[in-house]
Amino acid sequence: MQKHTPSVSCSPFPSSHKFYQQSLLFPNVRVPLRKILLTDGSGESPFNVYDTSGPYTDENVIIDITKGLPAIRIPWLSERADTESYPARLVKPEDNGFTHGKDLTPVFEKKRPILRSKNGKSITQMTYARAGIITAEMEYVAIRENEGLIEKNKQHTTSSKAFDASIPEVYTAEFVRNEIACGRAIIPQNINHPECEPMIIGRNFRVKINANIGNSAVTSSMAEEVEKMVWAIRWGADTVMDLSTGRNIHNIREWIIRNSPVPIGTVPIYQALEKVHGIAENLTWDIFRDTLIEQAEQGVDYFTIHAGLKLAFIPLTIDRTTGIVSRGGSIIAKWCLHHHKENFLYEHFDEICDIAHTYDVSLSLGDGLRPGSIADANDEAQFAELKTLGELTQIAWEKNVQTMIEGPGHVPMHKIKENMDQQLALCNEAPFYTLGPLTTDIAPGYDHITSAIGAAMIGWFGTAMLCYVTPKEHLGLPDKNDVKTGVITYKIAAHAADLAKGLPRAQLRDNTLSRARFDFRWHDQFNLSLDPDTARAFHDETMPKEAHKLAHFCSMCGPKFCSMRISHDIRDAVAIKKTRDEGMAAMAEKYQQNGDLYMKVMPSIKETVDD
């Protein structure tokens, strides 16, 4: 038993409060949004923003991670009446890496029914969409993407080149349904993760970001990983992947899922490898299949499956600078070479789809041959695998399984567009999910920046979700601070992409913050930013007093050199001059029109002399 309840970050954002937008179609659908309150007298209305933080920033909710979050989707699932509960698979010693005794992470004690589709029923969001059915989940994400508005606000958009995307001015549940039906978008929502707030991944919606967490064989605990998840979603992570590779994988994952309001993804091959003591050659389909069912019953929303790495592609990596850098890809390659057999994930892909279909788990087809250096970008191995992923996507779609495609990696800027073009062509517009890409290899410790450059570009070109990179990339396991840095960096990249592709409302936040900056409304600047805490802390390092928040300058320029203060002076001077000039012009016109009424006619000088 636990001696105490671990605490997590659960305070509201400054000058913000959570509110819930009621659906007009579904009485039991209420969509959470965050309202940022701006300075009284500013003339600005409160500003609504998309919110991923779940109940953790709702001051009216009491958080207890031993109980988990409310199961908001249970009523929706019950109304559809196409799922059933059944006895769960028993937890085995190998599920937690053979950990026992005091080293075993406590079991999450609050039990819930395990669901699966009823025999003969298809319960995926793609099935409903293709049948013309609008689900509560589809309505939920439409409201969420609109940030609660039903009409597009006017804005000044600097660019709207969306590279053949079809972005509506207002999202509707019908638009969402159509995007899912044709495979251009997914709503990753395992029926066994009812705590999850629906979100959508697709190129015609706002660009999403994923944050990776997870323990390793040498570090981290359940409390740390739950806190990392909560911390990541506070700052804007749309999904979280649990990439745990050490002990207690099963129990830690249960704690994470029960307390997560965002979709949770995994790479099942990692846990399967732990079950065979880390010996890749000992992996079997039966072990992997059992792992998929274990994770699906827990509520994992999407699986990364490295089924596109075929035996014939492995020789294509021999002359690479950095070989195979994907952990999952290297595991599969080692198994294939040892057994001289085709990838068992490729061979059993039909069965993988059947399992995913039973629980509405989305598939994220892994890029096991992604380039790990810019020298290897866009090579034959990478695109051979991508072509295979496109073929596997068609198989998944035939079974109504929602699918997205994973992408690179390390790619210099001039080669990024080709990646997007190839993916769209080979994978029939299935959502693209990329790791960066990193645009240079010379900056260990700063790869959150090298990758954000590529992420912003490929997001503009059409990538639907960006996997964050932290400063610890290539160096170590990220801690809580690294997670925040990675998430904020990728929120910037995603927002920059949304601006470039002309997403409705994207520029409104920029415009609102810019007005606050020009008006020296310091608190509004802080509160409208992605990271209010850091913005306020940087300002207060040199001007900490509350009176400084009313100053019309900061420590960068001081009062005499502040360009915005000078701009205000120029505006005031121009306004005064304009008023004065307009007054003088009006008087001149008046004199010209009626001068004879005010001026005495004087005799000429000559007439005066003659007299």
Curated annotation (Swiss-Prot):
This protein's pathway reads: Cofactor biosynthesis; thiamine diphosphate biosynthesis
| Binding note for cofactor | Binds 1 [4Fe-4S] cluster per subunit. The cluster is coordinated with 3 cysteines and an exchangeable S-adenosyl-L-methionine.
Its UniProt entry gives the catalysed reaction(s) as:
5-amino-1-(5-phospho-beta-D-ribosyl)imidazole + S-adenosyl-L-methionine = 4-amino-2-methyl-5-(phosphooxymethyl)pyrimidine + CO + 5'-deoxyadenosine + formate + L-methionine + 3 H(+)
- Which Pfam families does the record cross-reference, listed alphabetically? ThiC-associated (PF13667), ThiC_Rad_SAM (PF01964)
Write one Gene Ontology MF term.
carbon-carbon lyase activity
UniProt binding sites for substrate? 212, 241, 270, 306, 326-328, 367-370, 406, 433
Q: Which cofactor does it need?
A: [4Fe-4S] cluster
Which controlled-vocabulary keywords does the entry list? Answer: 4Fe-4S, Iron, Iron-sulfur, Lyase, Metal-binding, S-adenosyl-L-methionine, Thiamine biosynthesis, Zinc
Q: Name one GO cellular component term.
A: cytosol
**What's an example GO BP annotation here?**
thiamine biosynthetic process
Residues binding Zn(2+) are 410, 474
Identify the InterPro entries for this entry: ThiC (IPR037509), ThiC-associated_dom (IPR025747), ThiC/Bza_core_dom (IPR038521), ThiC/BzaA/B (IPR002817)
Question: According to its UniProt entry, what is the function of this protein?
Answer: Catalyzes the synthesis of the hydroxymethylpyrimidine phosphate (HMP-P) moiety of thiamine from aminoimidazole ribotide (AIR) in a radical S-adenosyl-L-methionine (SAM)-dependent reaction.
Q: Quaternary structure per UniProt?
A: Homodimer.
Output the HAMAP family linked to this UniProt entry: ThiC
Q: Which PANTHER family match?
A: PHOSPHOMETHYLPYRIMIDINE SYNTHASE, CHLOROPLASTIC (PTHR30557:SF1), THIAMINE BIOSYNTHESIS PROTEIN THIC (PTHR30557)
Query: Which family, according to the similarity comment?
Result: Belongs to the ThiC family.
What name goes with this protein?
Phosphomethylpyrimidine synthase
